[in-house]
Amino acid sequence: MKKHKGLKTIGKILAVILVFLLVINIIPPKKNVENNPFLVAKGELPMIAAHRGGGDNNPENTMLAFREAVNTIGVDIIESDLYLTKDGYLVYNHDSYIDETCNVNGDISLEEVEALCEIKENRHYIKDMTLAELEKYNFGYYFEDENGARIYKDVTDLEGTGLQIATVDKLFEEFYESNPDLLFIVEIKNSGELGYEACRILYETLNRYPEYKDQIVIGTFHDEIEEELKANYADLMRGAPTGTAAKFVITQFLGVNIFDNSDFACLQIPTSYDLGIEVYLDKETIIKRAHRRNIAVQYWTINDADGMRELIELGCDCIMTDNPELLKSVLEEYK
C-alpha cells in the first residue's frame, strides 16, 4: 500500500513539473529588442557576414577587403574587432599587435615573424602606436592568393589600394551614402580604461553616422566593458558575452527560458563547444527559442560548404565566414 502511495506521489510531482514546463513555454517571453535588423524573416536565407572582411578572399581587415566584400560579393554584414591606438583612433585588427598582418618587421617571412612574436616584448602593439605610424605599413604584405602567391607584397600606394590599417571612421564614411542598410558586428577588444575610451569613441563616431547607430551590434569578452555598454550606451545593441550566451543556451535546453532575463540582441555562437564532451549548438530549438525573443542567432566561423548548408537549413539568421564568396555561391543553391 505504501509503495502505491509513493508511486502516486511521484506521479503527481511529475505531472506538476510537466504542467509547469508546458505553461512557461506557452507564455510569450519578453522581447530582448523590439526592432532587430539582424533577424531574417521566416523562410528567408541567412545573412552573409564577412569575418574580418573576408580574410580568405582578401587581406583581412583592410579597406580592400571591406570594399570587395560589400561592392563585389554583396555581403550583408561586416564583422571585425576593434583596438584603440595610442592617439585615440579605433582601428580594425584581430590581434592586439600588428606583426603577423603587415611588414612592420621588414622583409622577413611569416614563419620568422611568428617566432619573433613568441617573445611578447618583440611585438608591435596597437595601443603603443599612433595612427600615422600604423598607416606606414602594408597590411596585405603576407596575404597569399589561392596559388600561394603574395600578390600585394610590393604594393607602394597603400592608401589607394586600401591596404593601410582601416579605421572605424573610414569604414563608415566609405559606405554611409552608398550602402545605408549595411550592418556591422564589432568586438571591443581593449579592457579597462582603454576599453571605456573605445566605447566612448565608437559612440561619438556613430553620432556622426546616425543611420548606422541602429545597425551595429557590439560584443566584448570583458565584463567591465559589457557593464559600461549597458550603463552608458544602452541605446546600442549588444551581442551576448560568453557567460550570458551559455546561460541562455542552458535555459533553452532545460525549457525554462522564461527565467532568462538577458537583454542582448544577437546570440553569436560556434556550432559546438568542447567542455570535456562536445556540446552541439547547431540546434533548431536554440534558434526557435531565440527568435521568440527577437534574438538573432549568428554562427561563427564557418568556412566549409557542408557546414554552411547545415546552418542554412536550420534557419539561422547569419553565418560568419572568412570566405563570403563561397557562402554566396552556396546560398545560390537555395534560390
Residue ranges and their predicted role:
Residues K2-K335:
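Phosphate-group recognition and catalysis centered on beta-loop-alpha active-site segments
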